[in-house]
Amino acid sequence: TIFHVAAAMGGAPADIFLNTVVTTKNLCEAIARTAPSRGNKPPLFVLVSSFGVYGVADLPRGTVVDEGTPLENKPARRDPYSQGKLRQEKLCWEYHDKGIIRLAVARPGVIYGPRGGAFSARVGLNLFGVFLHLGGRNTLPLTYVDNCAEAIALLGDRPEAAGQVYNVVDDDLVDADDYLRRYKQRVTPLRSVSLPYPVTMLMSHAVERYHRASKGQLPAVFTPYKTKTTWKGNRFSNEKLKAIGWRPIVTTEQGLERTFEHLKARAS
């Protein structure tokens, strides 16, 4: 079994493409070259993908995101990371279809835990020294790092996972309001401003107009499409992963407690 967890998390678009897509192609080509020595049995190839591959911008608010949710069909409107993960996953399916690998895809939501970051963009963004709280009551697709690792390992141990996709999110998920409130209580009284979704959409339209008028000099931090993708609000299912035997080994309450403990120690 091969576990492919590497990808560029940030940087220039060219760097993300190189370190996510090109490296994956090189790996798959190396597997193809070893095929004669393995006989006819292709290896089980577990790819760690991302919720970023889903195209949720045009779905109604509150739609359940599961493995049947359509993939993004307007990748140019998304961030470079999501574009890279989408291309990476499609590339792996091409090698699966050629019989070079037997692909099983894990699509984690927001992986969190000690030594990770404090906030996903789904909660909000830190701009000009103020945290803009944009997530409101939206459910966060959290998966604690230990639970995510268990899911990935499980796929590598399940031959029936080949040709399948599995969302990785935990049980008893909290919303962005709850997460931010707990952070302020447990870590630091962060200065924040809450923006309702309609206000964020108005800002997004304004930023997009100024971005075009400035011929790209003003970064398009917000666009209406990105805003709908990130902050409109969805629900999330882990039923398919549970059907093959996965269960969270760390509850969300425990995971948040451990994470905030570490963040507090790091801040001090």
Describe each model-derived feature in a short phrase:
Residues 58-111, 132-134:
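Catalytic helix-loop patch of NAD(P)-dependent Rossmann-fold dehydrogenases
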Residues 154-221, 257-260, 266-268:
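Mid/C-terminal beta-alpha module of Rossmann-like enzyme folds, strongest
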Residues 1-26, 55-56:
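NAD(P)H-binding glycine-rich loop region in Rossmannoid oxidoreductase-like domains
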Residues 26-80:
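Conserved Rossmann-fold NAD(P)-dependent oxidoreductase catalytic core, especially the SDR/UDP-sugar
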Residues 113, 134-138, 166-173, 184-186, ...:
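Glycine-rich Rossmann NAD(P)(H)-binding loop
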Residues 236-243, 247-268:
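Amphipathic terminal alpha-helices
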